[in-house]
Regions:
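Outer-membrane beta-barrel channels and translocator barrels
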Residues: 69, 80-81, 117-121, 198-202
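N-terminal entry motif of extracellular EGF-like repeats
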Residues: 57-59
Length: 248
C-alpha cells in the first residue's frame, strides 16, 4: 500500500512507527505491549486501519477448515398383482462454512408411489413427493458478507483490548453477524394422479393431473450491535450496514 501511494505521489498510508510495530507483532503476536491497536489521542475511539499493526487472517477467522454433510435414506416397497406401493424417507444435513454462527441446511423428504390395477385394461397411479427445507444462517443474502471478508485489512484486530461482552470493533463483521439471524422454512408438495386405459394391446390412453404447492416462512431477527470505547463506555453502533436488513 505504501509503495502504491508513493508511486502516485501521495504520502505513505502506514507510518514508519506502525511498520516497526508490525514487525514486532509478527515476532510476538499480542505479546506484552503489543495489543495490535491503541486509542486515538482524545481517547474517544480506536485508531483506524492506518495505525493498527495486527496480523489477522480473516478467512481463517470466519471460515471452517471443513464442513459436515450426511444423508440417511430408508425405503419400503411391496404389494400384489392388483396393488403396489413404495415409500421412501430421506434426511440430509449440510453444514455451512461459517465458523462463528449458525449456518446449516436440514432437508427432509417423503416420496410415495401407489399403483392400483383392478383389471388388465385399467390402472391408477398416485405419486407424492413432500420436501421440507430448514435453512439457518445470519442473512438472507450472504454475498455482501463474503465481499466484506475478502476486503478486510489483515493489519486490523479482531477484538479491542478491553475485556467484556462488547469487545468486537465496528470493522469486524462478526459484530453484526452476532446480532442477526435468518431462518427459512419451506415445504413443497408435488402430487401426480394418473389413470391409464388400455382398450387394445399397445394402445394406452392416459389422463394425468399434477398439483404442486409451496409454503414458505421467512424470519429475520436483528439486535442492536454494541462496542466498547477505550474509556470503557458502551457505544451503540447505529451506522447503516449494507446487506444487514431483510430481504437482504
Amino acid at each position: 500500500k505504501n509503495a502504491y501511494r508513493s508511486a502516485i505521489g501521495e504520502s505513505p498510508y502506514f507510518s514508519q512507527e506502525t511498520i516497526d510495530l508490525m514487525n514486532q507483532f509478527l515476532q510476538n503476536p499480542y505479546g506484552e505491549g503489543l495489543p495490535g491497536i491503541t486509542a486515538n489521542q482524545e481517547n474517544t475511539g480506536w485508531r483506524g486501519g492506518e495505525s493498527q499493526y495486527a496480523n489477522t487472517d480473516w478467512f481463517d477467522y470466519f471460515y471452517k477448515n471443513k464442513s459436515l454433510r450426511h444423508s440417511h435414506n430408508l425405503s419400503i416397497s411391496g404389494g400384489s398383482d392388483k396393488v403396489t406401493y413404495y415409500v421412501g424417507l430421506g434426511y440430509t444435513y449440510q453444514g455451512g462454512l461459517l465458523d462463528r454462527v449458525e449456518d446449516s441446511l436440514d432437508k427432509y423428504n417423503v416420496n410415495t408411489k401407489f399403483q392400483i390395477k383392478p383389471n388388465d385394461w385399467l390402472k391408477f397411479n398416485f405419486n407424492n413427493n413432500i420436501t421440507l427445507n430448514l435453512i439457518s444462517r445470519p442473512l438472507p443474502d450472504m454475498s455482501i458478507l463474503y465481499h466484506q471478508i475478502a476486503r478486510s485489512q489483515p493489519n486490523m484486530v479482531t477484538e479491542v483490548p478491553i475485556s467484556g461482552l462488547y469487545n468486537l470493533p465496528s470493522w469486524n463483521e462478526a459484530l453484526y453477524l452476532d446480532n442477526v439471524g435468518y431462518s427459512q422454512n419451506r415445504i413443497s408438495d408435488a402430487m401426480t394422479f394418473a389413470a391409464t386405459v388400455t382398450p387394445l394391446k399397445g394402445w394406452d390412453i392416459i389422463g394425468e393431473m399434477k398439483v404442486r404447492f409451496d409454503v414458505q416462512n421467512d424470519e429475520f431477527l436483528q439486535k442492536q450491535p454494541r462496542t466498547t470505547r477505550p474509556d470503557g463506555t458502551i457505544e451503540n453502533v447505529t451506522a447503516p450496514r449494507q446487506g444487514y436488513s431483510y430481504p437482504g
